[in-house]
Amino acid sequence: MKTQKLFWGTLIILSLHISLFAGANDNTPFVPDANMSRADIPSIYKWNVYDLCASDEQWDKDIAVCQTDLKELKSFHSNLDTPAGIAKYMAAYFNLDDRINRLTLYANLNREVESSNQQAITRHELGLQLTEGLMQEGATLRQTILGLSDQELKNALQNEPALKEFIPFINSLRRRADRVLSPAEERLLALAGDNLWAQIDLNELPAAPEKAFRSLISELTLPMVTGLDNKKVQLSFANYGPLRHSTDRNIRRGAVEAMFGTIKSLENTFATTLGEQAKFSLFLARARGYDTVLEAYLDKDELDPAVYHNLINTVRANVKPLHKYVDLRKKVLNLDEVHLYDLYVPMVEPVSIKLDYNNGVQLIQNALKPLGKEYMKQLKAAMDPANGWIDIYPSKNKVSGAFSSSTYGVHPYVKMNYQNTFNNVSTLAHEYGHAMHSYYSITNQPYHSWRYVPFLAEIASTCNEALLSRYMIDHAKTDAEKAWLLSELLETIRTTIYRQTLFAEFELRFHELVESGVPVTAEKLNNIYAELIHAYYGPDYVMDANDHIEWAYIPHFYYKYYVFTYATGLSSGIAFAEKITQEGPETRETYLNMLKGGNSKTPLVLLREAGLDLTKPEAIESALQLFDKTVDELRALIVK
């Protein structure tokens, strides 16, 4: 799944006195060093991959057994005309699936921390090959289940008790049985690159237009611009962000104008790649009987398109707080006009807060207490390095970034590159939101219904961040610190709810062009994007000549209706954090039950049972009301 990290503090290097937080460790804290050899990092700070597999040598033996077992699955094919034969085949298939998942995760975790280790790279590739082989075998499994009539399936379940274990998988598969075509038609769609029926994440299978877009982006020749040190530098996607954040208006304006000017010169090519992507998605949707691309891609996770439209309609009805934010930015930065290049420079002087891992953990645990004793007991154990969930510090050849990854029957894993900043603390809270969601799902669901859908994935993580943000704001020691925390909260909501919803509306609009048979041109896309910018950002925001071309370099528009989940995820996380804090134990329990639900029910049912209905405005409104309130809080602090 493609995901975007949602930070509650993105720009800062933080430094509060250790004494601010309870539970400070008297021992000398470990000092992170990204150039340190992994061998020099104490083992207590490394995750325990041996909970997945006993050793590298055992991995080599186990992968060989799996390779043999994959070939032997074909021996079951001759008995798939009986319920007992189907049950034995499914048991063997999913047993192998479980073992491959563990071995693949073991290999991936090792490669993440030692990216230049050839053995780790080789094992990772072997794991991927085996996964691909099992996916190909899965076609036989799907065809077998889908080939049964309703009566045949009913009889099979009555006559073969061993099949009942697989009911969640069977029901999920057969829900879309009417979308499956004849064998000949299925073969043609597969040759065309069908990704509506993929066993893996839809967006893991890029079509040709997306590949062309990526090549175009990678080959862009960007001009020289003035850098942060006032010397000429080559503009790149890597330095564009820092330049756009510069406090020197000439520097940030120069970077934005250079980027958009270059992209504008290729606007027709970008319009072609995006238009062809939409046409291909529509072809696949219509081939399977869907009216729209939106309906097709949301159906995989049983999502009602009403969720998508509700997000857009609710945000559109609540853009005035964003207009207030633009006005506040104008006043604070003492600007005559607010342009795109003025949206990313900090409104408030960054506060410096340094926290070693132990103190960061204590801060998180203090902030998450509203989640209750059950959650906190498990979280405390999960964050204890001795229990092997986490790989904490950076080292030479360790891949940058952070993630949480899980497989059934084993505790989740969390990768960090912790360097004692509050940014890292926020990331840690986020990743443990994912990890705890997976833990609850794994320990409360059977194998076939533990893996929650991507639509739910960002809720637990952003709920944790929302609770951490509120705790920090409530316990700020100075007005300057509180102002900075408030400004970071505003920026998170602006960029994740408002901006991603604007993207979602743009994505809907250009797909509607294709669905209506209207040619997709750069002019049409530019006009749609400009109209949305005006509507969202309001009268105090001034568009420059090439601002309408921003759509052209956004990769999310090739991800087939995925970008909206960032906005719904953060909105839901904020709504849950607010409800849990204000309403107490009963709401907390319904929230934890949602985490425990895995994929046992549809995502919308799980959310409704927890108290959120994303087909209605309330959850989105809750997040935007927080934004509005925060604008007022910040204005009161910094506008004299």
Where in the sequence are the language-model features?
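C-terminal, non-catalytic "cap/extension" segments appended to globular domains
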Residues: A39-I41, Y50-A54, I145, R175, ...
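Bacterial N-terminal signal peptides
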Residues: G9-S19
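Active-site-adjacent "gating/activation" loops or surface patches in catalytic cores
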Residues: G227-T247, I353-A429, G433-S438
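Post-HEXXH active-site segment of zinc metalloproteases
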Residues: T427, S438-T462
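Long, K/E/R/D-enriched contiguous segments that form extended
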Residues: L328, V332-K380, I390-D391, H437, ...
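Bacterial N-terminal signal peptides that target proteins for export
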Residues: M1-T10
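A well-structured
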Residues: G23-P350, V361, L637-V639
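Glycine- and acidic
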Residues: V49, R244-M259, A296-L311, D342-I353, ...
